[in-house]
């Protein structure tokens, strides 16, 4: 059994995941009635979601209680990159929507859903999540609360004994080991997720609402393959594409099928460790990115809102488009704190144009129809950019120190 496991782990993870994708797609088309296969995907996603809050909590405490002051500069750089990238996503979505205007067929109202009524409500939700009970935050995977309490505990424990710090560090290492075991079975999880998608939706979702999907996905691909390389080059001053493709293979592919930035946090941390990045930095920036680095969500909110405006014949001038970009970026940063994510923040952006809640809910309904593709690509972009920008900021510091950048 041990020999079989060693042979399995000897094959590179991307190759194993690719094999799982192919087998899952074939099984989904050949035997779609074998619904039991999809449980592999559910087990994988739930295992990652289960371990991620504990991993983040103890890694952040371990990192901060032993951290040196020099790490603050890197973290500030990463946060600036996150916020700029999210705003850039909204701007690109505005340009794409202007070049390829979309209208929607809104035949019937979507099911009534509770959505935020204004930016104040989004900010209030974020602030309340910060001070939520730490045990509740871990149980509910409230990463804003987890980060806030972990930072407080980590700073408070800087004066603790070396033995206490060692115990915390050992516990964090044990959690990281468990994550490694889970990730080794990612191909089976991806197999189940792909099977579920293909057997349930087939290829139909790629043909309906094709123009809308093309603008959404096209904008996200433009961000990943055009603007991201520019940002990375600014940081590392060398060819950015090896790092771009590494993050694509190791982070985006998994996030595409799990459709969960939270579930992808352990995977991103694993890749950071492989690249030799500073754990004191990435243990903070990766979970933080899952909350505020939301360029994919900004694209979705902007494109869907402008599609609603076009459908109703509402003209959108340049100043309004700029305001929409900022509003979408701010809303996107709150997407992780709202059940339903970016789609349920569409009414907030629609309010800028005086679009009624009924119409906004119909737009959300369209979003749920294309969600199997839109949400997958959005999550892949969001989560892989957490890894990409965290690495780029770290490599920027290495470049300044004259260290060789290898990944």
What positions do the PLM features span?
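The feature identifies polytopic integral membrane transport proteins across all domains of life
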Residues: 39, 75-79, 107-111, 239-256, ...
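Helix-loop-helix junctions within the multi-pass membrane cores of secondary transporters/permeases
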Residues: 250-332, 389, 400-407
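Transmembrane alpha-helical segments and their short flanking loops
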Residues: 303-407
